[in-house]
Amino acid sequence: MIERKWFTTAEVAEMLGYGLSKTKTLVLSGEIHSIKDGRNRRILPRWVDEYVERRAREAEMEWSA
């Protein structure tokens, strides 16, 4: 069985609990890395993890300030 390597923007939105439009904005702005695959965007699981970790670090820095 082939292991899934990519997520769609809609799948990432659901994983993060964000709306689709917010997630598309994050992807198009580069906040969440992606590649263009035809008409679609594809996102590696590690890119989602990197985004979450970056947001957590930013929040921790705000709390400690």
Q: Model-derived features: where do they sit?
A:
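Polyanion-binding surface elements
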Residues: 1-22, 54
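Major-groove DNA-recognition helix of helix-turn-helix-type DNA-binding domains
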Residues: 15-45
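Intrinsic disorder/low-complexity segments enriched in polar/small residues
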Residues: 4-6, 25, 59-61
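A generic structural micro-environment signature
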Residues: 7, 13, 38-41, 49, ...
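A short, Lys/Arg-enriched interface patch at domain edges and termini
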Residues: 46-65
